[in-house]
């Protein structure tokens, strides 16, 4: 008897007609749609640049055979990162004008001591490259800190609702939220995130056509809310997007004014190690996230935000000691910020 041959079931659904978004890489798009790179068809040469030019039409087989999140864009990428849309936004003035709990709140930061709450928001925005508007909207949605008073004692001490004594206080709560959103945002860019998981273990596949900013929002709210609550939160007419519009106006209009984050035709420039040719330095650590620790027990075993590697010049003593060796730029460009820890 000849053995029977079983073939995988075919999905008869029509292929996706997907228009590339700013920041899309071929490998990441393939991972999000669950296909191989060679199966993606386009009239454009997708290997010519590091990123696919925005608006490029891609024909992609439909291999999605499981429930997905809604294909509704909630937040443009330019309103997630600390981009040109934040130019001119005065966090202190906005918070004081709202006259809520945050306007008189002070927080303690280990690096600088006691600071005003709005200054802490600005610091978190700059250090993590996240829009201050987004942080304020999250703080208002979850805890009513910006325009009123905390909704209860839990949200006074844990404003994002993450009830863990290691994360007590506004800045550490916002750091928790930022880290989760960044895991999703950059994971979507890299093609390493495809699903969200709710507290009860239920999973949903992220619609592959979403932008990274939307994925960050969907991912964060799935961490502490049930699927039914989450569905209400992401409702653009009555949930978090509606609150965001109410507080700050149309984010998509601001994003359109500044254009895509990544210009068309972008090619990754070559990078060099950050020390002079011939100098002896040691590779001392990394890759790791830029600020604090991404604990696997909090964020999951497979998630991190790789943004830094560590080098140290040769020295007579071990440990952190002053050194006059030059640090050089990894690529041509402007130095736009130099502070402690940077």
Task: Enumerate the predicted regions with their spans.
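Primarily a LysM-type cell-wall glycan-binding module
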Residues: 2-36, 56-58, 62, 81-123
């Amino acid at each position: 008897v000849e053995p029977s041959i079983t073939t995988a079931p075919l999905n008869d659904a029509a292929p996706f007609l997907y228009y590339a978004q700013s920041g899309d890489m071929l490998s990441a798009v393939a991972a999000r749609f669950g296909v191989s790179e060679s199966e993606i068809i386009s009239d454009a040469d997708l290997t010519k640049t590091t990123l696919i030019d925005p608006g490029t039409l891609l024909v992609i087989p439909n291999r999605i055979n499981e429930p997905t999140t809604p294909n509704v864009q909630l937040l443009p990428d330019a309103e997630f990162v600390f981009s040109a849309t934040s130019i001119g936004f005065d966090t202190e003035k906005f918070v004081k004008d709202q006259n809520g709990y945050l306007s008189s709140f002070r927080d303690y930061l280990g690096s600088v001591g006691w600071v005003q709450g709005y200054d802490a928001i600005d610091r978190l925005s700059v250090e993590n490259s996240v829009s201050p508007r987004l942080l304020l909207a999250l703080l208002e949605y979850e805890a009513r800190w910006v325009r009123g008073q905390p909704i209860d004692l839990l949200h006074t001490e844990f404003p994002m609702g993450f009830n863990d004594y290691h994360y007590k206080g506004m800045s550490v709560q916002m750091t928790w939220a930022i880290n989760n959103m960044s895991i999703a945002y950059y994971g979507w860019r890299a093609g390493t995130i495809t699903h969200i998981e709710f507290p009860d273990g239920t999973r949903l596949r992220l619609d592959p056509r979403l932008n990274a900013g939307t994925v960050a929002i969907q991912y964060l709210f799935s961490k502490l809310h049930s699927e039914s609550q989450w569905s209400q939160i992401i409702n653009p007419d009555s949930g978090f997007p509606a609150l965001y519009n109410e507080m700050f106006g149309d984010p998509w209009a601001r994003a359109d004014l500044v254009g895509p984050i990544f210009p068309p035709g972008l090619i990754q420039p070559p990078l060099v190690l950050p020390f002079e040719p011939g100098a002896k330095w040691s590779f001392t650590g990394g890759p790791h996230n830029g600020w604090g620790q991404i604990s696997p027990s909090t964020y999951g075993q497979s998630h991190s935000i790789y943004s830094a590697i560590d080098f140290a010049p040769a020295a007579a003593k071990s440990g952190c000691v002053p050194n006059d060796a030059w640090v050089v730029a990894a690529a041509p460009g402007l130095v736009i910020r130099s502070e402690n820890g940077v």
